[in-house]
Amino acid sequence: MQAHNLVYFSSVSENTHRFVQKLGVPAMRIPLHSRIEVSDPYVLVLPTYGGGRTAPDLQAGGYVPKQVIAFLNNEYNRALICGVVAAGNTNFGAEFCYAGDVVARKCGVPYLYRFELMGTEDDVTAVRAGLANLWKEH
């Protein structure tokens, strides 16, 4: 694998994929049905699933896509994560971008940014700046 700054998962909605494309940085996509292994430090970008329940239950689980869980269950992949960026929908209320909270906490890495759906140009600018700062430190 070449050096990649981002690893991301995007469902068939392609919202996260479109956001990552706007960033214009090297990225590797976690596939829907197969496994990948990374060899370089990366920031994970992922959507949040399961939001908007009748009563928010932040302990219920189901926020992190199964493909991301499988990816992070690989100890090599987990060891190289440097930060998390999450997508979500503000309609989810307290669960907005909650997958980022889950992954950052479980992996002990910073939660760098959260954005709605495909993100705005301001989101793209902020994430680019955050990535540049992070990679200076690594």
Curated annotation (Swiss-Prot):
Q: Which Pfam families match?
A: Flavodoxin_NdrI
Gene Ontology terms, MF aspect: FMN binding
Lineage top rank: taxon: Bacteria
| NCBIfam families per the UniProt record, alphabetical | nrdI (TIGR00333)
- Function of this protein? Probably involved in ribonucleotide reductase function.
What HAMAP family is this protein classified in? NrdI
Q: What is this protein called?
A: Protein NrdI
